[in-house]
Amino acid sequence: MRKYVIMGVQGSGKGTQATMLGEDFDLEHISVGDIFRWNVQHHTKLGAQVRRIMAAGELVGDDLVEGVVKAKLAEHDWNFGFIIDGFPRNERQAEFFLESYDIDGVIHLDMPDSEVRRRVLARRLCSGCGMDYNLLASSPRVAGKCDVCGGELIPREDDTEEALAVRLRDYHQKTNPVLDIFRRKEYVVTVDARPGRETVQQAIRVKLGLPPRELPLPAAAAGGQADGQPGAAGQPGSGGQPGG
């Protein structure tokens, strides 16, 4: 049973890489961000709190985040491993996590801020069904419309230049020290997150000592993309169940 943390600045592909690992190794993908977005979309009390924070481009407070993680892991089926993204984000959260849970490794997706801006500002969310898109990877068949339900594609509420600048600042100030804590315990493997998703996935597996992933058929044969640009059109987003 494998237990991993995946870390990286927003837009580095944490969700995509975590999902790929989860599918092949029976790991539950626990995404703190997806849990929050699900609550925002469904107008829960937690969602109202998070909406105000996200709109300001700030990070959610420790007590709120730790409560969500505790609740999610309390219901986790421990016959399966997990890969958690979006947590821990600062030293206090890291200390709480290490005191509470054993892990096998920390995957650090490394990416320069300039590439983060390029990726994040290309993200879109279906206003109808919640499917995630990234216009750098693959445009929808009809511009501005969801391939699944035909809903309007809109930027995420917190994907603005101003909000992103705040998140990048907070990331470097608060998250880098977390990596130092994990490095001292020799948990961290660092992978360049700039190449295509399949290249990044294979690099992660090499560094973790996991079997390689079977590569998909080339685009011409499979009728789709092979190792394209980061992010994906038609990836499940906040319209699904949180953290699944």
PLM segments and residue spans:
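ATP-dependent small-molecule kinase phosphotransfer cores
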Residues: 28-102, 114-115, 121, 125, ...
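P-loop (Walker A) phosphate-binding loop of NTP-binding proteins
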Residues: 9
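Hydrophobic anchor at the beta1->P-loop junction of P-loop NTPases
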Residues: 6
